[in-house]
C-alpha cells in the first residue's frame, strides 16, 4: 500500500513519465510557503533562501548541520595583517547550470564574483540599472559602505578590500545573500531584455538545477550531474511541495507523499514521534520570536509607552498556549546559545497595573487605536502568530487600547513592514552565521532600518557599541561591547523578546543524512532516500 501511495504521489508531481523512472531517487520536501523569487540578494526570509539554497554556492559555506565555515567556490583565502584585504583563490572547473534559453560557454571564474558583488555595491551598475532592486542583508550589515572594492588579480583570484576591519566578514560571505551568480547569464539576460529572469529563472553552480516553479504549488529541481562535489548529489529529483497548513504537511508525511517537512504544530509532535515510519530531528533553537514597536509611530516613539506595552505582555501564558513544550521564555535580543549573551539582563516584571500608570503619565488616552500585525505563516520562532496576536490583543485591551489585528500574504507582510506601515508587529529571526552582529547589527542597528530593523529604532549610543564590536577581533573585547549594547537595547525597549523555540524537524525514516541546521536552513546536499 505504501508503494502504491508513493507511486501515485510521484505521478502527481510529474516525477515519472515511464517505468524506468521508478529507479530514480526522488525526495519531496513539504515546505511552508511560496518564495518571492530566487535571487537571494533581494530577500531575508527563510522561505526564499530555502528555495534558492539547492541552486547556488558561495565562496565559503557553513558545514552541513553546523556553524564552521569551510571552502566552497573558494578553495582557500588569506587575510592581510591589517585585516583589510581578503584574497580568495577560486575553484577550477566549476560548471554553471543551463536552461532552455542559456548554455554557458565557460566555467566559473573571477568575473562571476565581481558581478555578484559589484551589482550590490554600485548603484549605477548596468544590471542594477536595468533591474532595480534592494539588497537588505548587504545593506543592513553595512557591507555596501565597508567593502571599498572587489578586484580580480587573475582568472581565479579575487581580492576584497575593506574600509575597516570586519570580524564577521568570512561568516557573512557564507550567507545566502552572497550566492554567486553567472556574469555570462546576466549579460545574456541584458541582451535579451529580460533581466528579471535572474530572479525567476535562476542559474547557479549548486547541487540541484532549477526546473520550474508554480506559486502555491511546487518547485522542481533535478540533481546536477556536473556538480563539482559529486558525492553531495544523491537525489535525481528534488521537489518542494508548498503547503501553508502544518497539519496538511504532517498528513502528507504520514502518507509518504513527502519525506521531509518543517514547523510542525506542537500538538502533532507526540503522535509523529510514536510513528515508527517517521522520526523527529531536534535541535535547540538558535532563534527569537519578538514584538517590534514602530518607534516612528506615536505613541511608540516614547520610551515609557514601550515600557508599558512590554510589562503588560503575559509571556508565560503565551509560552504555554502558543509554544507548549517547544518554547522557552526569551529575555534578551538574541538567544542564550549565542556567544556574548548577557546573562545579567532580566525582564521587567509582568505588571499591568504599573503599565496603566505609565500610560496615564505619558498622556495616552483610553481608546487609542493601534494595529498589531500577525504573520500569516508558521515560522520556527513562532508556531502560531494568529493565536499570539489574539493573546496580545487581550493583554493590551486591558490597558485601554483598541487593538486591530492585521495580516497579509508573507511576502507582502515583509514588504509593508519594511516600509514602516505597522504600529506593532510580530516577527522573529533565526541566526544566519553564528556571530552576534547577525543579531545586534542586522536587526536593531541604524543601518538596518528599511531592511530588518522593524522597530525603526536608531540609537547613536547603541550603534556606536555595535560598530566598534564588529571592528575588534579579540572575542573578549567584542563580548564586553556587545553586552553593553544588549543592556542599552533592553533599557530602550524597541522590542519585547517573547520566546526561543526548539526546532523539531519531522522526516521519513527512509531519509539518510539530513542534518538540522542551527541557522534554519533546509539543505539537501548529501541527503539520500532508501
List PLM regions with ranges.
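Detector for C-terminal structural segments
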Residues: 25-28, 167, 214, 218, ...
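N-terminal lobe/hinge region of extracytoplasmic solute-binding protein
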Residues: 30-82, 118, 125, 203-205
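A structural "hinge/loop" feature
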Residues: 34-50, 73, 100-104, 167-179, ...
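Aromatic- and charge-enriched surface segment that lines or borders ligand/interaction sites
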Residues: 75-126, 159, 252, 299
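Surface-exposed binding/hinge segments that line
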Residues: 89, 121-122, 126-186
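Ligand-site clamp/hinge motif
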Residues: 193-199, 224-271, 282, 389
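Structural transition elements
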Residues: 208, 294, 300, 329-362, ...
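A bilobed periplasmic-binding-protein/Venus flytrap-type ligand-binding module shared by bacterial periplasmic
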Residues: 222-226, 285-308, 312
Amino acid at each position: 500500500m505504501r508503494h502504491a501511495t508513493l507511486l501515485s504521489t510521484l505521478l502527481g508531481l510529474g516525477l515519472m513519465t515511464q517505468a524506468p523512472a521508478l529507479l530514480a531517487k526522488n525526495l519531496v520536501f513539504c515546505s511552508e510557503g511560496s518564495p518571492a523569487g530566487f535571487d537571494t540578494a533581494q530577500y531575508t526570509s527563510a522561505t526564499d533562501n530555502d528555495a534558492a539554497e539547492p541552486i547556488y554556492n558561495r565562496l565559503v559555506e557553513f558545514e552541513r548541520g553546523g556553524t564552521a565555515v569551510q571552502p566552497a567556490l573558494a578553495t582557500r583565502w588569506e587575510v592581510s595583517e591589517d585585516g583589510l584585504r581578503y584574497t580568495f583563490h577560486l575553484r577550477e572547473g566549476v560548471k554553471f547550470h543551463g536552461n532552455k534559453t542559456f548554455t554557458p560557454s565557460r566555467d566559473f571564474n573571477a568575473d562571476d564574483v565581481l558581478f555578484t558583488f559589484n551589482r550590490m555595491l554600485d548603484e549605477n551598475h548596468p544590471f542594477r540599472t536595468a533591474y532595480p532592486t534592494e539588497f537588505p542583508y548587504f545593506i543592513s550589515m553595512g557591507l555596501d559602505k565597508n567593502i571599498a572594492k572587489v578586484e580580480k588579480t587573475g582568472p581565479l583570484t579575487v581580492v576584497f578590500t575593506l574600509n575597516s576591519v570586519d570580524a564577521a566578514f568570512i561568516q557573512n560571505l557564507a550567507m545566502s545573500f552572497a550566492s554567486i551568480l553567472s556574469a555570462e547569464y546576466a549579460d545574456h539576460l541584458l541582451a535579451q531584455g529580460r533581466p528579471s529572469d535572474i530572479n525567476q529563472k535562476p542559474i547557479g553552480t549548486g547541487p540541484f538545477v532549477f526546473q520550474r516553479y508554480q506559486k502555491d504549488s511546487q518547485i522542481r529541481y533535478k540533481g546536477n550531474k556536473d556538480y563539482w562535489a559529486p558525492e553531495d548529489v544523491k537525489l535525481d529529483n528534488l521537489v518542494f511541495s508548498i503547503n501553508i497548513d502544518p497539519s496538511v504537511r504532517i498528513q502528507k508525511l504520514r502518507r509518504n507523499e513527502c519525506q521531509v517537512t518543517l514547523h510542525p504544530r506542537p500538538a502533532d509532535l507526540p503522535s509523529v514521534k510514536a510513528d515508527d515510519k517517521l522520526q523527529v530531528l531536534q535541535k535547540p533553537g538558535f532563534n527569537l520570536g519578538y514584538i517590534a514597536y514602530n518607534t516612528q509611530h506615536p505613541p511608540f516613539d516614547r520610551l515609557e509607552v514601550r515600557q508599558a506595552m512590554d510589562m503588560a505582555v503575559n509571556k508565560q501564558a503565551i509560552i504555554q498556549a502558543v509554544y507548549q513544550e517547544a518554547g522557552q521564555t526569551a529575555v534578551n535580543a538574541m538567544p542564550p546559545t549565542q556567544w556574548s549573551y548577557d546573562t545579567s539582563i532580566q525582564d521587567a516584571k509582568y505588571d499591568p497595573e504599573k503599565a496603566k500608570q505609565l500610560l496615564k503619565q505619558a498622556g495616552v488616552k483610553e481608546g487609542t487605536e493601534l494595529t498589531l500585525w500577525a504573520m500569516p505563516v508558521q515560522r520556527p520562532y513562532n508556531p502560531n502568530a494568529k493565536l499570539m496576536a489574539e493573546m496580545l490583543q487581550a493583554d493590551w485591551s486591558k490597558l485601554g487600547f483598541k487593538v486591530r489585528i492585521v495580516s497579509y500574504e508573507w511576502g507582502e507582510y515583509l514588504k509593508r513592514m519594511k516600509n514602516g506601515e505597522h504600529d506593532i508587529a510580530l516577527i522573529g529571526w533565526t541566526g544566519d552565521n553564528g556571530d552576534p552582529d547577525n543579531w545586534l547589527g542586522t536587526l536593531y542597528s541604524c543601518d538596518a532600518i528599511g531592511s530588518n530593523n522593524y522597530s525603526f529604532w536608531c540609537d547613536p549610543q547603541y550603534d556606536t557599541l555595535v560598530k566598534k564590536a564588529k571592528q575588534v577581533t579579540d572575542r573578549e573585547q567584542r563580548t564586553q561591547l556587545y553586552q553593553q549594547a544588549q543592556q542599552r537595547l533592553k533599557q530602550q525597549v524597541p522590542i519585547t523578546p517573547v520566546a526561543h523555540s526548539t526546532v523539531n524537524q519531522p522526516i521519513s525514516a527512509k531519509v539518510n543524512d539530513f542534518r538540522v541546521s542551527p541557522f534554519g536552513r533546509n539543505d539537501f546536499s548529501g541527503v539520500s532516500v532508501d
